[in-house]
Amino acid sequence: MNIDNIWDDDQKLIPAIIQDKFTKDVLMLGYMNKESFRKTLESYKVTFFSRSRKKLWTKGETSGNYLNYYSHEFDCDEDTILVQATNEGPTCHLEKYSCFGLSLIHI
């Protein structure tokens, strides 16, 4: 698999699902471009492209709650990436282990 085939456009963003390496829980969803993916592989710190700030964002650079990259897999369409990582603290900005888990509707 060639990174240039996945990111045929340097500005293209793909969803990145972050999964706890050990528990397999989903921790968060972010977006990666080619540059943030390369930085993740080089630094072993999960790095996203912030759509609101229009720049790279390494998870934990402000809070210290880094996500340490372990491995990745692309889906069958090569338009979503699953990243396995370990966290150095709460993943969510609300100081929770995961950004997921809030149930608003009970059926």
Regions found by a protein language model. Name each.
Residues 1-13:
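Short, basic/aromatic recognition patches
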Residues 4, 15, 69-71:
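Short, acidic/polar N-cap/turn motifs at the starts of alpha helices
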Residues 11-33:
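Active-site and channel-lining beta-strand-loop segments
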Residues 22-23, 34-37, 78, 88-90:
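Short, charged/polar surface micro-motifs in flexible loops or helix N-caps
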Residues 34-48:
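A short, polar/charged loop-to-alpha-helix boundary motif
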Residues 46-102:
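Short, structured beta-strand-loop surface elements
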Residues 105-107:
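Conserved small/polar residues in nucleotide/adenosyl-binding loops
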